[in-house]
């Protein structure tokens, strides 16, 4: 094929500009057509095998009406032009199978999954594909070379809360994603939870709504789930996913709570996804209510139906035994299955994910929702299964990176005083009046009558119920990273603002007479982060769609953002990456927290330097020592002659470069973002055993 025919000018900025207009509104009725393809194509990444040099993934298409097996053909060729005018382009088709049949309003719904298994080359490749002969401009994705680590996106909170006034948000950050994808070539998009907001099940499942509004606790806790209720819940999740994943269509509880995210749907077809789920994929707070409420029949049904459709739409597998999809559901090699007993509420094993993203890059997505209870996120057995798999996979990854998807931030300010207040007996009279609807009706939730915000606090790793488990998890991550010389970076969302938490080797202070040994150790920690075996960043990117919290919340978090001693050798704090406003001029007091909509990407330094546009935009080179912060056309990262302060990091050949893309102005349809950047150095040393003396809540000697 001639190069000019292959390298077309795919220009998302021009093609999808009109798709952003009206993203603060939606049609009154569902956009799902009565027949034909009603959802998809949706791409999913399974794994990259750099020994066998194979790329594995899947495409899902959903059809309504008559059974009609769509055909997906593809072309595989180079992603970038070379000196050759004629290039080799291979053509074939993806093998598909019907893996699930469903019913929506008496119509048959057919789920088709197509296996992607492609050879990797010594250069990055582009795949263009067509569905039943139709090749849209965005029907394409990129396969890295077998020597290349992937460019990835991390995002969360992909939807609005029920009563948000969406008229305040004229832009779509998914438009920004597509514009950058044109020249960055993202190989994977990591969904950190809340890919869909399902809280409106309370509005659209009548029997569930009536049950939730029941004031009599005895009646509420003893209600049996009827077949009609089950069917309403099932129909809700199926239609809700088809509306959102097929058309970006959603409406909430007020006339001003509407959105149509068309660019999200296009992103599903051009960037393969790896997803874990969180509470809003089910219903707000699921797993963080008391055990007696979680075990009510109606709430068990909600969790189990949400799980079924999460698996179908986000993982492209069927959890139903009658579909015969057992291999994909339980035996596919990307899964790390949890405790054999399964979840107490959902009744299934947790599905954490391990995938390779490059010869020196892997990802671990922890399923922190399926097993979740008020007092436990994972069982001991599940942790042992996770660590066994991770150690087996990364034992030869020295100098590489492990990205850990952890939906809820783990390096985040403590709000214990709020937990104490919300559970205090002092509030009992107000809670009673609120439950009865006499006073402050929104003060308590309609589930179990707890204070409305308590489930959010109970979800957090720093909640009093989870502190021990949190510290155990961080300790294990530090131990494994140090043992194998792997830099671990945690990717989180959930909190509707951006931040960068940090664990690092302790800087010794407050010595009346600082010993020479301590001074040398401090110098090493500051000047050689590549040798800091305790260094773990927690990149928090949230929300790509939902509304950010008010300025007062960012101010509160900044005041609570103190230096903590995780153990005697590890400090925990946050990186002041947001020292300037998005205009690049005005200073921010809340330097560790940015309460604007955002998403993030993680680019290997080698890829960055080989990309002319990225290299020009970011303006860094190997050997630079930079202070994390804002990058604009007029302003690059501040560079230092020496690494003489704790918040500066080197740009290294084996490192990563993470950018949090923060929305400039939510009222503008151009959806422009501003970049806040941080280099993440690789780990060049190992340590067989770390000391964790002084760690709280664990008996470590």
UniProtKB/Swiss-Prot annotation:
List the GO cellular component terms. Answer: membrane; mitochondrial outer membrane; mitochondrion; plasma membrane; prospore membrane
- Taxonomy, superkingdom: Eukaryota
Q: Which Pfam families match?
A: PhoD_2 (PF19050)
Q: Please share what else the UniProt entry notes about this protein.
A: Present with 3230 molecules/cell in log phase SD medium.
Cite the PANTHER family for this sequence: MEMBRANE PROTEIN, PUTATIVE-RELATED, PHOD-LIKE PHOSPHATASE DOMAIN-CONTAINING PROTEIN
Q: What is this protein called?
A: Uncharacterized protein YGR266W
Question: What lineage, starting at the top, does this entry show?
Answer: Eukaryota, Fungi, Dikarya, Ascomycota, Saccharomycotina
């Amino acid at each position: 094929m001639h190069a000019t025919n292959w390298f077309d000018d795919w220009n998302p900025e021009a093609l999808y500009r009109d798709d952003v207009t009206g993203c603060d509104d939606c049609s009154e009725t569902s956009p799902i057509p009565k027949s034909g393809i009603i959802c998809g194509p949706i791409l999913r990444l399974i794994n990259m095998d750099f020994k066998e040099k194979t790329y594995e993934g899947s495409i899902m298409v959903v059809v309504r009406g008559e059974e009609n097996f769509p055909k997906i053909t593809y072309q595989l060729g180079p992603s970038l032009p070379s000196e050759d005018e004629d290039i080799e382009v291979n053509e074939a088709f993806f093998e598909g199978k019907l893996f699930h049949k469903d019913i929506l309003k008496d119509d048959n719904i057919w789920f088709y999954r197509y296996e992607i298994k492609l050879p990797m080359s010594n250069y990055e490749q582009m795949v263009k594909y067509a569905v039943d002969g139709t090749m849209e401009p965005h029907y394409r994705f990129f396969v890295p070379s077998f020597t290349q680590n992937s460019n990835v996106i991390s995002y969360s909170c992909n939807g609005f809360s029920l009563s948000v006034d969406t008229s305040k948000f004229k832009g779509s950050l998914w438009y920004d994603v597509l514009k950058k994808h044109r020249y960055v070539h993202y190989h994977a998009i990591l969904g950190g939870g809340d890919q869909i907001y399902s809280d409106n099940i309370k509005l659209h499942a009548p029997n569930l709504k009536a049950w939730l509004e029941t004031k009599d606790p005895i009646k509420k806790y003893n209600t049996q789930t009827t077949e009609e209720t089950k069917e309403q819940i099932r129909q809700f999740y199926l239609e809700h996913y088809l509306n959102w994943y097929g058309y970006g269509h959603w409406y909430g509880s007020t006339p001003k709570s509407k959105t149509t995210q068309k660019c999200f749907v296009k992103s599903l077809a051009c960037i393969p996804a790896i997803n874990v789920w969180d509470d809003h994929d089910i219903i707000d707070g699921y797993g963080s209510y008391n055990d007696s409420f979680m075990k009510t029949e109606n709430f068990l049904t909600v969790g189990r139906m949400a799980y079924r459709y999460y698996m179908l739409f986000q993982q492209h597998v069927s959890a139903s035994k009658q579909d015969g999809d057992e291999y994909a559901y339980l035996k596919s090699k990307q899964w790390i299955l949890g405790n054999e007993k399964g979840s107490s509420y959902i009744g299934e094993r947790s599905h954490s994910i391990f995938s390779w993203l490059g010869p020196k890059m892997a990802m671990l997505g922890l399923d922190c929702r399926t097993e979740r209870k008020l007092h436990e996120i994972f069982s001991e057995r599940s942790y042992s299964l996770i660590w066994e798999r991770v150690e087996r996979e990364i034992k030869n990854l020295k100098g590489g990176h492990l990205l850990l998807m952890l939906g809820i931030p783990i390096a985040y300010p403590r709000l214990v005083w709020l937990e104490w207040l919300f559970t205090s007996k002092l509030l009992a009279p107000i809670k009673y009046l609120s439950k009865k609807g006499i006073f402050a009706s929104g003060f308590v939730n309609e589930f179990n009558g707890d204070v409305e915000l308590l489930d959010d606090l109970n979800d957090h790793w720093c909640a009093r119920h989870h502190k021990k488990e949190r510290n155990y998890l961080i300790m294990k991550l530090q131990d494994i990273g140090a043992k194998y010389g792997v830099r671990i970076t945690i990717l989180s969302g959930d909190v509707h603002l951006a931040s960068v938490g940090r664990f690092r080797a302790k800087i010794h202070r407050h010595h009346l007479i600082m010993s020479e040994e301590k001074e040398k150790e401090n110098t090493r920690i500051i000047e050689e982060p590549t040798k800091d075996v305790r260094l773990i960043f927690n990149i928090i990117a949230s929300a790509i769609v939902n509304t950010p919290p008010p300025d007062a919340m960012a101010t509160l978090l900044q005041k609570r953002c103190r230096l903590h001693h995780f153990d005697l050798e590890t400090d925990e704090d946050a990186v002041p990456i947001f020292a300037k406003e998005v205009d690049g001029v005005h200073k921010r007091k809340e330097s560790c927290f940015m309460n604007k909509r955002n998403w993030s990407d993680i680019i290997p330094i080698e890829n960055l330097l080989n990309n002319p546009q990225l290299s020009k935009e970011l303006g860094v080179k190997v050997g630079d020592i930079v202070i994390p912060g804002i990058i604009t056309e007029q302003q690059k990262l501040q560079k230092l002659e020496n690494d003489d302060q704790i918040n500066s990091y080197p740009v290294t050949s084996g490192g990563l470069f993470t950018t949090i893309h923060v929305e400039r102005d939510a009222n503008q349809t151009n959806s422009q973002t501003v970049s806040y950047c941080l280099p993440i150095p690789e780990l060049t040393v190992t340590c067989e055993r770390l000391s964790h003396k002084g760690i709280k809540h664990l008996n470590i000697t």
